[in-house]
From Swiss-Prot:
The modification N-formylglycine is found at residue 44. Residues 22-43 form a propeptide. Transmembrane segments: none annotated. The gene is MELT. GO terms for cellular component: extracellular region; other organism cell membrane; pore complex. Changing residue 64 to S: In melittin-2; possibly an artifact. Keywords: Allergen, Amidation, Antimicrobial, Cytolysis, Formylation, Hemolysis, Ion transport, Membrane, Pharmaceutical, Porin, Secreted, Signal, Target cell membrane, Target membrane, Toxin, Transmembrane, Transport. It comes from Apis mellifera. This is Melittin.
Length: 70
């Protein structure tokens, strides 16, 4: 019985120390990336529009070809 109590205590100590271990700090964001994002908040919209204008016609033509084939 004493052995089981000792095993349980060791397990508890290891488990609690694992839970409360300090996590690694997250890396700080690069100041240049933050400045770029703040300077042009609509840059992402331009990328989305570019994908839509180039990819959408290709998708439509692919669908038309598939419908004609079968």
């Amino acid at each position: 019985m004493k052995f089981l109590v000792n095993v349980a205590l060791v397990f508890m100590v290891v488990y609690i120390s694992y839970i409360y271990a300090a996590p690694e700090p997250e890396p700080a964001p690069e100041p240049e990336a933050e400045a770029d994002a703040e300077a042009d908040p609509e840059a992402g919209i331009g990328a989305v529009l570019k994908v839509l204008t180039t990819g959408l016609p290709a998708l439509i033509s692919w669908i038309k070809r598939k419908r004609q084939q079968g």
